[in-house]
Structure formats: C-alpha cells, structure tokens
C-alpha cells in the first residue's frame, strides 16, 4: 500500500515537471512571433519599390514611402474605360478606351516616377473607323501630373493633324514642340493593330528630322526617361552613324543606367569621331576622359 502510494506520488511529480517546460516554451514563443511580425512591417515600411494602384476614380502612387493621390484620373463610364498598365519599376501607363462614336479611340499615357513627381513622357492616340487608321505619338517635356485633370490630358495633341490610312498602319512621332521627326511602321492590318493595341510588336522607326530626334532624346534623359532616350538614340546612331553628339548622349544614358561597359565604348567612339572630323577637342566634356580610363 505504502509502495503503491509512493509510486503514484513519484509519477505525478514527474508529469508535473514535464509540463512546466512546455508552458515555458509557449511563453517564450510569443515574443519571438511578435518580433517576427514587427520585422516584416519594418521591411515593408523600408521598401522603396514604387507602387501605383487605383482607388475609385483616383490614381494612388507610393514612391519612396510618400503617398500621392491624383484625383479623378480614372474614368469608367458608358463610353470610356480606363486601364492601368504596370510596365516596370520605373514607369507605368494609363490606357483610355473610348467607343462613343463609329470611330473608336484609344489613348495611352506613359509616365515615369521621379523624386519631384510623376511625369508624362508621351501620349499615343490611335483611332480606327470608316476612314481607316491613324496613330500619333506626342512627346512631352516637364509635364508633371500633379493637379492635372483628365480633360487636360485629353487636350494634349489636339492640334495635331489626323492622317488616316486605309491600307497601311504607321505611327507619326512628334517632339514636344509638335514637330514631326519620325514614323514607325507596323506589320499589321489597320483593324488588327487597333484591336491588339497596345500589345503590338515594335515596328521599324524611320527618322526624318535627326535634329529634332536628338533634341527629344536629350530632353527624355533630363526628365529621367532613360530607357526611352536610349531607344531613340540607338535609332539615330543606326541611321546617322556620323552624328557625333548622339554617341555622347547615348554614352551618358548608358552610364546612368549602370551599363558602364557599353557607355565606355560609346564615349570612345564619340572621342574618335571628334578627332577624325577635326572638331574642337576643347569642347569634349571632362567626364568623357574620366570615364574611359
């Protein structure tokens, strides 16, 4: 009897001692879980990736932890719809689809993020109807989206001529001064291009005014639209290989986007052309020599 009582007492003590570490383990895990949640929140708070979303009629942009609301830019009515297109971490687009008349219209606005706001890089307009297809791109300089209205966006390029094509499908490209400087031809029928837009493969750009094209590429770089500037400068060099300043401008853009190896090649080409064409070498920027070392 006594032996049985001692055995029971010993077994109960053993169970009690085993339970206490389990209770202690549970109490320790709570602060660890809380710390993990806090770390995740801090990580989100320090996330510098730009973010753009739609809330009702407004465009919400978060850039470097700063939230900006662009009011009433989202229009979804009987005849107009708005689509937000996330292009990359540096840019996005708004596409307005209008079908109120027999001539269907799409307008695409390409924006970039900047420390001083959201800037409109270019506006593309494509129309399709009984007259055929017309398509234009207008570049903008220093067009900050802050306090702009949908009506102001719509009015951009209103003075440009409408050149409809029945058989072809090409894009007329204008600089920020409304000067046409290039065309872009597509291998689509007019109807297929309109239906597929903006998901169309790049066409061939033909530059007709190299001075305006180069100036526009330089202006794109100034507002931080480096990829757009790069594409245009590459076309200039391909079609006008003796255009000296284009090599310098392209090298500067490549340097900005951290492609230093290609930048050095174009700095060297720029310097070589300056020498071979007997240009004034005193006009060569010091950064050219510094960066090709």
Please provide the spans of the model-predicted regions.
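Canonical tetratricopeptide repeat
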Residues: 215, 249, 283-284, 288-291
């Amino acid at each position: 009897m006594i032996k049985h009582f001692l055995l029971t007492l010993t077994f109960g003590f053993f169970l009690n001692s085993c339970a206490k570490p389990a209770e202690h383990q549970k109490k320790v895990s709570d602060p660890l879980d809380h710390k993990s949640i806090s770390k995740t929140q801090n990580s989100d708070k320090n996330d510098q990736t730009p973010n753009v979303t739609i809330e009702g009629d407004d465009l919400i942009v978060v850039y470097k932890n700063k939230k900006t609301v662009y009011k009433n830019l989202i229009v979804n009515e009987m005849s107009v719809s708005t689509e937000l297109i996330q292009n990359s971490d540096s840019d996005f687009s708004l596409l307005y689809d209008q079908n109120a008349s027999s001539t269907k219209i799409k307008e695409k606005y390409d924006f970039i993020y900047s420390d001083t706001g959201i800037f409109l890089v270019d506006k593309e307009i494509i129309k399709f109807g009984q007259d055929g297809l017309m398509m234009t791109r207008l570049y903008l300089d220093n067009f900050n989206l802050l306090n702009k209205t949908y009506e102001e966006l719509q009015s951009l390029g209103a003075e440009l001529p409408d050149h409809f094509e029945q058989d072809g499908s090409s894009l007329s490209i204008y600089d920020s001064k409304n000067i046409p400087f290039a065309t872009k031809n597509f291998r689509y029928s007019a109807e297929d291009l309109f239906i597929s837009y903006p998901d169309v493969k790049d066409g061939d750009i033909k530059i007709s005014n190299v001075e305006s094209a180069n100036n526009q590429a330089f202006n794109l770089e100034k507002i931080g639209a480096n990829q757009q500037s790069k594409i245009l400068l590459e076309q200039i060099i391909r079609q006008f290989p003796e255009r000296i300043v284009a090599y310098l401008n392209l090298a500067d853009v490549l340097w900005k986007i951290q492609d230093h190896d290609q930048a050095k090649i174009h700095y060297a080409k720029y310097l070589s052309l300056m020498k071979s064409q007997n240009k004034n070498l005193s006009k060569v920027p010091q950064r050219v020599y510094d960066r090709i070392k």
